[in-house]
C-alpha cells in the first residue's frame, strides 16, 4: 500500500500503539531514543498533513458550504446554512437544533460566538464538517 510514511516510521508507530516507550523501541530497532523521537514526530506531522488534505478535499467537493466569521452568533448559522442549501438545491438532513449541537461540539465557539473564522459544510456523504476558510482565490471560468 502506498503511504507517506517510511517503513521506520510505521514500525515506530506500531510499537507505540502497543504501548512501548521510545527507549524500548530504540533498543528493538537498534537506534537511539532521539532518532525514535524524530521518526515519531515526523510521522505525526505527515499524518496531520494527510488529514488536513482529506478535509480540504471534502471541503472542495462539498454540497453546501458557508463561511462563518469570528464573533458570529452560532444561532444565526443554521438559517444561513439552509438558505445556501436551498439556493443550490440540496436537502439538508439535519434540523436547526442538530446543527447548533454540532457547532457547540465541534466548532471553535465560546459563549455562542465563533472564536475565529471557519467554514461549515455538508460533505459528499451528507455529514456536517468544520474546516478552515480557504484563502485561495476562486477560479474564474472563461
UniProtKB/Swiss-Prot annotation:
UniProt-listed SUPFAM superfamilies: DNA-binding protein Tfx
- Which family, according to the similarity comment? Belongs to the Tfx family.
List the source organism: Pyrococcus furiosus (strain ATCC 43587 / DSM 3638 / JCM 8422 / Vc1)
Supply the name of the protein: Putative transcriptional regulatory protein PF0535
Q: Which Gene3D superfamilies match?
A: DNA-binding protein Tfx superfamily, archaea
GO molecular function annotations of the record: DNA binding; DNA-binding transcription factor activity
Q: What does this protein do?
A: Putative transcriptional regulator.
Alphabetically list the UniProt keywords.
Answer: DNA-binding, Transcription, Transcription regulation
**Single Gene Ontology BP annotation:** DNA-templated transcription initiation
Amino acid at each position: 500500500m502506498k503511504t507517506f510514511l517510511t517503513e521506520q516510521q510505521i514500525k515506530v508507530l506500531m510499537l507505540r500503539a502497543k504501548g512501548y516507550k521510545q527507549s524500548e523501541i530504540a533498543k528493538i530497532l537498534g537506534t537511539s531514543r532521539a532518532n525514535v523521537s524524530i521518526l515519531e514526530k515526523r510521522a505525526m506531522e505527515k499524518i496531520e498533513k494527510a488529514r488536513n488534505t482529506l478535509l480540504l478535499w471534502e471541503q472542495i467537493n462539498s454540497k453546501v458550504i458557508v463561511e462563518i466569521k469570528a464573533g458570529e452568533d452560532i444561532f444565526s448559522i443554521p438559517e444561513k446554512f439552509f438558505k445556501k442549501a436551498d439556493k443550490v438545491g440540496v436537502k439538508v438532513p439535519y434540523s436547526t437544533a442538530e446543527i447548533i449541537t454540532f457547532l457547540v461540539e465541534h466548532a471553535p465557539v465560546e459563549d455562542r460566538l465563533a472564536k475565529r473564522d471557519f467554514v461549515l459544510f455538508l460533505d459528499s456523504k451528507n455529514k456536517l464538517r468544520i474546516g478552515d476558510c480557504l484563502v485561495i482565490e476562486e477560479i474564474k471560468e472563461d
